[in-house]
């Protein structure tokens, strides 16, 4: 079980956000998650859209979101539990992942990346859908796997990789992280990620 004690994360102010606007303006991507006060998230989202920044929402922890917010998200990265909460479709197989993605598209999201644990990651745009497999690994601790995936995903996008290659890179990062205990301490080096990808061309 993962518990959230928001603390300072629930107290982000308009002044805090205003100080960040120059950084947002210079950015290519904005990655958000739901462990901060939501009004702060939506203010940052508005700034990102104002400056033409690609917006990515990691929908953790799972909760319902208004359609007017989802319509401003370029890429959404839920796990299967979060995808079901936001679409009403249990993501138990690829067919249902496809259906869930269609619901997100109807809400205005441009790309959907659903992490499916040991089943891999389902990546979809209105034009292309694909399940990317994940190699079997010895799982020790899944805490932080979603953070590992999302961090790797945005890193790869910022390096110019397309949606599918970015998801593949993120899959590798998360696969390595779950083989170690902890969160920050479990994150692999870039060399380890590149080696893992080279050893698993089937990903």
Where do the language-model regions lie?
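A short alpha-helix capping/helix-coil boundary motif
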Residues: 1, 21-25, 78-81, 131, ...
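Conserved N-terminal subdomain of the carbohydrate kinase-like
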Residues: 1-31, 46, 193-203
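Conserved beta-alpha-beta core of the PfkB/ribokinase-like small-molecule kinase fold
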Residues: 6, 16-17, 29-99, 119-121
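Short aromatic/basic micro-patch
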Residues: 11, 77, 187
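Structured loop/turn residues at beta-strand edges in well-structured enzyme cores
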Residues: 22-25, 71, 107
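Conserved phosphate-binding/catalytic region of the ribokinase-like
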Residues: 63-69, 94-203
